[in-house]
Regions:
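Long, polar/Ser/Thr-enriched low-complexity segments
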Residues: 1-118
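Charged linear interaction tracts used for macromolecular binding and regulation
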Residues: 75-193
Length: 193
């Protein structure tokens, strides 16, 4: 039932009527629209997208602002975007979207020679993300894979502007990183200037 202080459609009507219309105030104007009840079927495709986007969004927790890493990343973040949205877009461009992106990110992180991604990721506050209705076998992106995604994004930014990230560990190719490089990377994400 809509709440009113005057005839319906005037002043401040709010609420729904007959499961068909919704009255509300938007930007100071009284508005009416059809009632839409969103569906959440939790399909496999939806799970894959939520898993990848959710994990990449969570990875932002590892970055302290300001930090040395953040300052360099902000330099190449496109105007009108946050560094997080630029990172998500870039990582999807690197690994792919949906189930393809999840599988590629997990494979890249698992195939990396440094073995301390998980330990370091836990140390910077990252946690695994699991979505049970995503593609079977690819229902989790670990904290270490989230940290690896930021590292891959970093090297992509460095390729576009070599003057950025001109320090260790970024002078070593990501594929050649060892445990000390991963630890140094996490420190760069967290070091306040």
């Amino acid at each position: 039932m809509a709440k009113v202080v005057a005839p319906l459609g005037s002043f401040s009507a709010s609420g729904k009527i007959g499961k068909s219309l919704v009255f509300f105030s938007h930007l100071g104007r009284n508005v009416v629209r059809g009632l839409v009840t969103p569906a959440n079927p939790q399909t496999v495709g939806q799970g894959d997208s939520r898993l990848l986007l959710g994990a990449l969004g969570r990875s932002a927790r590892a970055v302290v602002t300001p930090s040395d890493w953040f300052n360099d990343a902000s330099t190449v973040t496109p105007s009108g975007q946050t560094w997080v949205s630029a990172m998500i877009t870039n990582v999807i461009n690197i690994f792919g979207k949906g189930a393809t992106g999840v599988a590629a990110l997990n494979a890249a992180a698992d195939g990396q020679s440094a073995t301390n991604w998980e330990t370091v990721a836990d140390g910077v506050g990252l946690t695994d993300l699991t979505i049970t209705y995503a593609t079977t076998g690819e229902q989790t992106i670990t904290a270490g894979a989230q940290l690896y995604a930021i590292a891959a994004h970093t090297f992509n930014m460095k390729a576009s502007n070599p003057a950025l990230f001109d320090r260790s560990p970024y002078t070593t190719a990501l594929s050649a990183w060892d445990a000390a490089d991963v630890t140094e990377f996490a420190t760069d994400l967290q070091t306040v200037v």
